[in-house]
């Protein structure tokens, strides 16, 4: 069939939908709005309102917007085939949306409409759409059925392994449908022929009635017609017989037509029954496929278990004479169990000790955090006291420097006096002539006795200077200890003063922030109050606010009812989740049993190998094929286990996807209900309500700012402490 005719037939099929967008011609369908609306009617669960909202309604002559809409429609249809229907279109040429958007290409439009037709005949409401197709014209119906057949031939299931029996049943049902369709066409043709015959007979009947009327007139005119001896009478009798025969034949034809109409209705009912049976057969085919797969898996597992049982029997026969080995095995098992229990107890004790240590460490960490906070406070105090002590130390050092300078000056004066004393003594000795005796008595001025020839004033002054010199030396030696004690006292004073100043500073900052918040609140209240003329407006606003609050309470009550309905539905979901959890636990338990059996088999196999090697070393060469066969069986079992694990992972992924879909559906439903409640609230509310809520938000913002400002210093200190 020509692609143009196919496109026209599909456009006629699309006209069976009740669409708001224009959809009479290819140009009307070029923007993709009508097709997206039809997809929303075909599968509203998949093509939702949010998806339809992405379609640009005002594309007009802008071919780029039309191309964007058509791309969204094409990707949505392909995703529906792969995700919902589980089919992949292999050899079907996808439509070129660019040529449709630019040139309104009829061939590409026909391909796109053919894909939408496939979605319609495979969706949940496919029976309704098939009935609509059966009610169309014969040529259009034939073209649409050919398009469906072409699309079904190029579809392939996403999961391989479709049974040939199912395909055979599908072909049989398709052949039955074709036969029923042909029988329907024959019956329709027969009904048409009967209608034509009835119409002809009705025309003949009308003619005969006219002729009868004429003859009756003639009979009335001529009474001699009733006489059979005359030709007119014989003609009259013959015509009356013909009229009676024609009436009987018309009655018979009408009854036949009614019978054929009833048969046609019965055939249509049979067609519907066959379509339902076809769906049931498809479902049964899928179930049989799953059951056959399970039977194959169970058959393979049964064969492998029988092989394993045979091998176990052979090993049992070989191990009947090895009682000592069994005893040792049992002893080893008991010992391993005892060791495992001991290890488990040790681990439990270690875990308890570690838990107690962890609790102790947590307490220590908390104590250390407290100590760190105290130490930070002490450090701040110590810093302030250190500053004060450094200032005091500077003053003490200056005082020390002054004393050192004074000491140096006193030393110089002492040396000068000593020199003067020596000069005076020498002069006196020279004058008396006792040079040798006096020269032997002259010694160091500090440690020697003062000569008797020195005058008493100078002697007193020298003694006083020596005493002062000794005192200065002792004071210089003890100044370090005194400085340390003084600096420690100054440091304590500085620390105490620093703590006091910090607390005062924080209290002052908090008081300043509180006063700022109060000032802002007073300013906002003054701005809200304004002039006395606004009091009336505030009263009206309060009344409106009360009305809106009542409406808001009604909306909240409705929302609460909807939430209760959702809460009533949630136990069903929780019960299904519990069932899934139980099945998962059973599956995990079976996996653990399989792993334990596999480990036990391996252990028995290794022990048997070691026993065979120790008992009969000559048969090691002959037993290698058996060992190889056992290895092959183990590899097959490992492959089976890997296959089961992959199936388990797939089932787990599908279950997680189902849970995500359920959760997303619940969230979407809750969001829609919340959105409806908010929209109803906004529709019932007015502009005054928005203004009032804005003022309320401003008050809340100022109050929050006040609370944050009051709590900020402590919070900042805690953040610094954590860092």
UniProtKB/Swiss-Prot annotation:
Region Disordered, residue ranges: 682-723
Protein name: Protein Hook homolog
Annotated signal sequence range: none
GO biological process terms, semicolon-separated: cytoplasmic microtubule organization; cytoskeleton-dependent intracellular transport; protein transport
Annotated Low complexity bias: 696-711
Top-level taxonomic group: Eukaryota
Coiled coil: 162-423, 457-665
The family this protein is said to belong to: Belongs to the hook family.
The protein's role, per its UniProt record: May function to promote vesicle trafficking and/or fusion. May act to link a number of membrane-bound organelles to the cytoskeleton.
Species, as recorded: Branchiostoma floridae (Florida lancelet)
Molecular function terms from GO: dynein light intermediate chain binding; microtubule binding
GO-annotated cellular components: centrosome; cytoplasm; microtubule
Subunit record text: Interacts with microtubules.
Disulfide bonds listed in the record: none
């Amino acid at each position: 069939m020509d692609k143009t005719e196919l496109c026209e037939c599909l456009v006629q099929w699309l006209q069976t939908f009740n669409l708001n967008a224009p959809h009479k011609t290819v140009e009307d369908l070029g923007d993709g709005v009508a097709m997206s609306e039809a997809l929303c009617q075909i599968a509203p669960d998949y093509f939702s309102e949010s998806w339809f909202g992405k379609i640009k309604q005002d594309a007009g002559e802008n071919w780029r917007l039309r191309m964007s809409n058509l791309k969204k429609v094409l990707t949505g249809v392909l995703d529906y085939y792969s995700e919902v229907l589980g089919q992949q279109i292999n050899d079907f040429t996808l439509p070129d949306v660019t040529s449709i958007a630019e040139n309104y290409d009829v061939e590409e439009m026909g391909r796109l409409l053919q894909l939408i037709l496939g979605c319609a005949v495979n969706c949940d409401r496919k029976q309704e759409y098939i009935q609509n197709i059966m009610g169309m014209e014969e040529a259009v119906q034939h073209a649409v059925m050919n398009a469906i057949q072409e699309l079904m031939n190029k579809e392939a299931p996403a999961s391989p392994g479709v049974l040939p029996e199912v395909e055979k049943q599908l072909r049989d049902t398709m052949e039955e449908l074709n036969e029923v369709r042909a029988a329907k066409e024959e019956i329709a043709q027969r009904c048409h022929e009967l209608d034509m015959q009835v119409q002809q007979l009705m025309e003949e009947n009308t003619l005969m009635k006219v002729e009868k009327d004429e003859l009756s007139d003639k009979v009335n005119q001529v009474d001699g017609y009733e006489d059979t001896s005359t030709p007119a009478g014989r003609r009259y009798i013959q015509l009356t017989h013909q009229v009676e025969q024609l009436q009987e034949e018309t009655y018979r034809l009408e009854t036949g037509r009614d019978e054929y109409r009833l048969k046609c209705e019965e055939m249509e009912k049979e067609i519907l029954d066959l379509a339902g049976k076809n769906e049931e057969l498809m479902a049964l085919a899928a179930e049989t496929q799953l059951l056959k797969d399970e039977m194959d898996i169970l058959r393979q597992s049964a064969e492998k278990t029988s092989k394993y049982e045979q091998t176990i029997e052979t090993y049992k026969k070989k191990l009947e004479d090895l009682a000592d080995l069994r005893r040792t095995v049992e002893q080893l098992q008991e010992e391993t169990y005892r060791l495992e229990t001991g290890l488990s107890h040790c681990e439990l004790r270690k875990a308890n000790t570690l838990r107690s240590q962890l609790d102790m460490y947590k307490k220590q960490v908390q104590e250390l955090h407290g100590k760190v906070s105290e130490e930070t406070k002490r450090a701040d105090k110590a810093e302030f006291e250190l500053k004060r002590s450094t200032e005091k130390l500077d003053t003490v050092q200056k005082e020390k420097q002054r004393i050192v300078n004074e000491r140096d000056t006193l030393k110089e004066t002492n040396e000068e006096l000593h020199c003067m004393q020596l000069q005076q003594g020498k002069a006196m000795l020279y004058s008396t002539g006792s040079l040798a005796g006096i020269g032997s008595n002259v010694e160091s001025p500090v440690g020697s006795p003062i000569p008797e020839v020195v005058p008493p004033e100078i002697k007193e002054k020298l003694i006083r200077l020596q005493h002062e010199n000794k005192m200065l030396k002792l004071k210089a030696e003890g100044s370090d200890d005194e400085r340390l004690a003084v600096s420690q006292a100054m440091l304590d004073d500085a620390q105490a003063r620093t703590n006091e100043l910090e607390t005062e500073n924080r209290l002052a900052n908090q008081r300043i922030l509180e006063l700022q918040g109060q000032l802002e609140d007073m300013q906002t209240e003054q701005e809200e109050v304004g002039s006395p003329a606004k009091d009336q407006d505030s009263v009206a606003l309060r009344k409106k606010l009360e009305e809106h609050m009542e409406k808001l309470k009604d909306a909240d009550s409705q929302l609460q009812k909807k939430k209760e309905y959702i809460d009533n539905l949630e136990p069903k979901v929780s019960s299904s989740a519990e069932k899934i959890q139980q099945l998962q636990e059973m599956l995990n338990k079976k996996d653990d049993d399989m792993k334990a059996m596999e480990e036990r088999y391996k252990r028995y196999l290794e022990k048997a190998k070691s026993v065979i090697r120790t008992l009969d070393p000559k048969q090691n060469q002959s037993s290698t094929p058996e060992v190889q066969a056992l290895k092959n069986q183990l590899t097959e079992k490992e492959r089976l286990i890997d296959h089961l694990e992959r199936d388990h992972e797939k089932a787990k992924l599908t279950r997680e996807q189902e849970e995500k879909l359920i959760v997303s559906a619940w969230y979407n439903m809750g969001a829609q209900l919340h959105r409806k409640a908010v929209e109803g609230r906004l529709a019932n509310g007015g502009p005054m309500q928005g203004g009032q809520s804005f003022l309320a938000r401003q008050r809340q913002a100022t109050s929050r700012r006040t609370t944050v400002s009051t709590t900020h210093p402590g919070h900042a200190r805690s953040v610094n402490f954590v860092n």
